From Swiss-Prot:
Matching InterPro entries: Omega-atracotox
GO cellular component, one term: extracellular region
Pfam families xref list: Omega-toxin
GO molecular function annotation: calcium channel inhibitor activity; toxin activity
Function of the protein: Inhibits insect, but not mammalian, voltage-gated calcium channels (Cav).
Signal peptide range: 1-22
This protein's name: Omega-hexatoxin-Hi1e
Localization (cell): Secreted
Annotated keywords: Calcium channel impairing toxin, Cleavage on pair of basic residues, Disulfide bond, Ion channel impairing toxin, Knottin, Secreted, Signal, Toxin, Voltage-gated calcium channel impairing toxin
Disulfide bonds: C46-C60, C53-C64, C59-C78
Domain of life (superkingdom): Eukaryota
Organism of provenance: Hadronyche infensa
């Protein structure tokens, strides 16, 4: 076994031992309760006035109407 192979074997062995010890210490336990909700909760956002809107409920004003854009095309935009 040459030096490079020995180094790789030691690196893999250290990684496996590290993962096993982290598991015994509870390092891989999932978040529970409010912590998980706080991490994955999305903040409510709305589309400001003048921006294109796909749905009425996404506009801050709750109103989405057809308007002419800079090219003269009719697009839905938040009021």
């Amino acid at each position: 076994m040459n030096t490079a192979t020995g180094f790789i074997v030691l690196l893999v062995l250290a990684t496996v031992i590290g993962c096993i010890s982290a598991d015994f210490q509870g390092g891989f336990e999932p978040y529970e309760g409010e912590d998980a909700e706080r991490i994955f909760r999305r903040s409510p956002t709305c589309i400001p006035t003048g921006q294109p809107c796909p749905y009425n409920e996404n506009c801050c004003s709750q109103s989405c109407t057809y308007k002419a854009n800079e090219n003269g095309n009719q697009v839905k935009g938040c009021d």
